[in-house]
A protein has these predicted regions:
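Loop-to-transmembrane helix entry
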Residues: 12-49
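Small-residue-rich transmembrane alpha-helices and their cytosolic helix-loop interfaces
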Residues: 47, 51, 78, 131-139
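Cytoplasmic helix-loop-helix junction between adjacent transmembrane helices
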Residues: 100-138
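Central cavity-lining transmembrane alpha-helices of secondary-active solute carriers
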Residues: 43-61
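Conserved MFS/SLC helix-loop-helix module at the cytosolic interface between two early adjacent transmembrane helices
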Residues: 55-94
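C-terminal membrane-cytosol helix-exit motif in multi-pass small-molecule transporters
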Residues: 180-200
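MFS 12-TM fold signature
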Residues: 78-85, 104, 182-186
Length: 206
């Protein structure tokens, strides 16, 4: 809701946001919904859009990793994720915020590559354990990620650094900066420590 309120103040009812909210209002009239329908439906649309892009791009990244290797695709996708967070830092308009989410969703489809890498390095007997560890990692991310993001959102860089407003700094830029930091750490670790798990010989040329 806070993100929606912010971009309503910035963009008003014009542009992409106005078009979306206009259709949401029409839907609300038909459904007879009560207060806060805008925020609830808006959040659902953003979350669904991100998940749909993950779903679409997961097989694409997985197929590409079969040809050029897991490490290369992970470097590409984590770089793309970092880019999406950088755009979020400077999302002074709703359109740029949506673009950041679209890019993030597309590159977040690398889950298939990560699980494939685990499958590459585990035996048949230990594969379930390896996949379980992946699940634990995701669970920890879902547990601590929102908590850290909510804490970071209390630091409004647009108020603390008003001279950066022209660059698109917004009330949620601090959370985006934190996300960039974790993403860069991930990227550096992959580049420095992650060894290719898919041997050259069995790779699919097609």
């Amino acid at each position: 809701p806070a993100i929606l309120d912010h971009y309503l103040q910035v963009d008003g009812n014009a542009g992409i946001l106005g078009w979306i909210l206009g259709h949401i209002d029409q839907f609300a009239e038909l459904a007879g919904s009560k207060d806060n329908y805008r925020a609830v439906l808006f959040g659902g649309i953003l979350g669904s859009l991100y998940a749909i892009l993950q779903f679409v791009f997961a097989p694409i990244w997985g197929s590409l990793s079969d040809r050029i290797g897991r490490r290369n695709v992970l470097l590409i996708t984590v770089s793309g994720t970092t880019l999406s967070y950088v755009l979020w830092i400077f999302s002074g308009s709703f359109g740029l915020f949506i673009l950041a989410r679209l890019i993030g969703g597309a590159f977040a489809g690398n889950l298939s590559v990560a699980t494939a890498a685990v499958a590459d390095v585990t035996s048949r007997e230990n594969r379930a354990k390896g996949m379980g560890i992946v699940g634990v990692a995701f669970g920890l991310g879902f547990l601590f990620g929102p908590a850290l993001g909510s804490v970071a959102s209390f630091f409004d860089l647009s108020l603390n650094r008003p001279n950066l407003a022209a660059l698109g700094i917004n009330p949620f830029s601090a959370a985006a900066v934190l996300s960039v930091g974790f993403s860069v750490i991930n990227l550096v670790w992959i580049w420095a420590r992650f060894k290719e798990t898919l041997p050259q010989q069995p790779r699919d040329p097609d």
